[in-house]
Amino acid sequence: MCTGDRKMPKSILLTGSTGFVGTNLVKSLTLKSDYIVKSAVRHAVNKDDGLLFEVGDINASTDFELPLKNTTVVVHCAARAHVMDDKEAEPLTLYREVNTAGTVNLAKQAIDSGVKRFIFISSIKVNGEGTLVGCPFKTEDNHAPEDDYGLSKSEAEKQLVALAKDSSMEVVIIRPTIVYGPGVKANFASLMRLVSKGIPLPFGSITQNKRSLVSINNLVDLIVTCIDHPKAANQVFLVSDGHDVSTAEMVRELAIALDKPTWQLPVPIWCYKLFGKLFGKSDIVDRLTGTLQVDISHTKETLGWKPPQTLQEGFKQTAQAFLQANNR
């Protein structure tokens, strides 16, 4: 029987497939006939699933030989997640164990296995914690991490770049900013809960800052683009929705998405600063009132890519999932 020039599906190994980004990436990739998606997981619930490989904790000694067999592309999403005010005795050691040593170990084994491309989901924290309005982070900026999580990601990036120079494996680095979407947790979910109550909120004066956000759909679309795009090789990409918002504007857009009234009281920013100092919450206050913008022009121009989903569309989708989950 003649099969013509039909291409063989590309084998992709994904780490972090049970996390927020990984779960959504698996959903997207499995809809495409071009890919065979394998997952390296800490614990495999279904050990008969031939596409799930139990590897235990990811660190410098994790054995990836079996899942890497016949793999063309690795997408490395797994990480020790950032924790505000980490209470561990030596958080940097723990971040490095997973985010740096674990990443480099996987990359080295990928090279030995003949993997063509390694996509690393890093963090905008490699660039730093904040910017001035109108002075966004750019791809070419020097690394300037300010916390242990960002440092561990920065160190991993530098070692990956060095490995790529000495091998035939291409490395692609993606630095997301704050990611939101259906099922999002942490601070974004907390903000949605507040807005969903329809009560007056004290964010009316926070109008001069700007935050770059990225919907999970836009991030996943960029990752999928980087799997095949020839110009993605050995590049660093920043990613956002392309529309930056102040805290007050973010709350207003969320209220619209949740179909709730929005009353924002103009509490002076100095009150926030004082609260942060008195109660040891300065990091949270800085995030609430500060600016963090990213310039995605390099991403768009290099790949011919643009975010397929607007911020308003992303907020609406996120809000609908939130309301369904909470039976509202």
UniProtKB/Swiss-Prot annotation:
Family indicated by similarity: Belongs to the NAD(P)-dependent epimerase/dehydratase family.
Record text on subunit structure and interactions: Homodimer.
InterPro entries referenced in this protein's UniProt entry, alphabetically: Epimerase_deHydtase, NAD(P)-bd_dom_sf
Gene Ontology BP, a term: O antigen biosynthetic process
Residue positions binding substrate: 123, 149, 198-199, 215-217
Needed cofactors: NAD(+)
Pfam family, one: Epimerase
Top enzyme category: isomerase
EC numbers on record: 5.1.3.2
Name the record gives this protein: UDP-glucose 4-epimerase
Effect in UniProt of substituting residue 242 to D: In strain: O22 and MO45
Superkingdom field: Bacteria
Residues spanning the membrane: none
Active-site residue numbers: 149 (proton acceptor)
Pathway: Bacterial outer membrane biogenesis; LPS O-antigen biosynthesis
Gene name of this polypeptide: galE
